[in-house]
Design a protein with these regions (language model features):
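Active-site flanking residues adjacent to catalytic metal/cofactor-binding acidic residues
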Residues: 59
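Short cysteine clusters
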Residues: 102
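Rhodanese-like catalytic fold shared by cysteine-dependent sulfurtransferases
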Residues: 1-41, 50-56, 64-97, 106-145
Length: 145
C-alpha cells in the first residue's frame, strides 16, 4: 500500500482512521507513562524468584479480612490508607526490594509512587495483584500470618 492509497482509504473511512490514530496515541502515552513511573511491574513468576532469593519485603495492602482469606506466603499486611514510607514494614528497607501487592493494583501503584518519591530504590508492584497470582496457580495461605 502506497501513500496515495493510504490517504484514499483514510478519506473513505474517517471514523476507522480516527479510531486507529486515537488508539495509537493512547498506546504511546500509556507506554511512556509506564516507562517513567519509577517503579517496576513484576509477574507472579518474577515475585516467586525474588522471594526465593531472599531479602524481598512483600507488603499486601489488601483489607485485613481479604488478607486472612488468602495471601502470599511471607507477605505482611498493611492497610493501604495507613501505609507510607515511614511504615514499620518498610522503614528500614530503602535498599531492599519492596514488592507491593493488593487485589486490584490501584492501592499498590499509589503506595509505590509514594515509596519511590521517598527514595526507595527497588520498588515493584505485582501486576494483576492477587488474582494474577491465583491465575498462575500459585498458592495462597489463609489466616493472619
Amino acid at each position: 500500500m502506497n501513500y496515495e492509497e493510504l490517504l484514499a482509504f483514510a478519506g473513505r473511512n474517517p471514523m476507522l482512521s480516527a479510531a486507529l490514530v486515537g488508539l495509537t496515541v493512547a498506546l504511546i502515552v500509556t507506554e511512556i507513562r509506564r516507562l517513567f513511573r519509577g517503579y517496576k511491574g513484576i509477574k507472579p513468576a518474577e515475585l516467586t524468584q525474588l522471594m526465593n532469593a531472599g531479602g524481598a519485603v512483600v507488603v499486601d495492602l489488601s483489607a485485613s479480612g481479604d488478607f486472612e482469606k488468602g495471601h502470599i506466603a511471607g507477605s505482611r499486611n498493611a492497610q493501604a490508607s495507613a501505609f507510607g514510607p515511614e511504615h514499620k514494614l518498610v522503614a528500614n528497607a530503602k535498599q531492599s526490594p519492596v514488592v507491593l501487592v493488593c487485589r486490584s493494583g490501584n492501592a499498590s501503584e499509589t503506595a509505590a509512587k509514594a515509596l519511590k518519591k521517598a527514595g526507595f530504590e527497588k520498588v515493584s508492584v505485582l501486576e494483576g495483584g492477587i488474582p494474577a497470582w491465583q491465575q498462575a496457580d500459585l498458592p495462597l495461605v489463609k489466616g493472619r500470618n
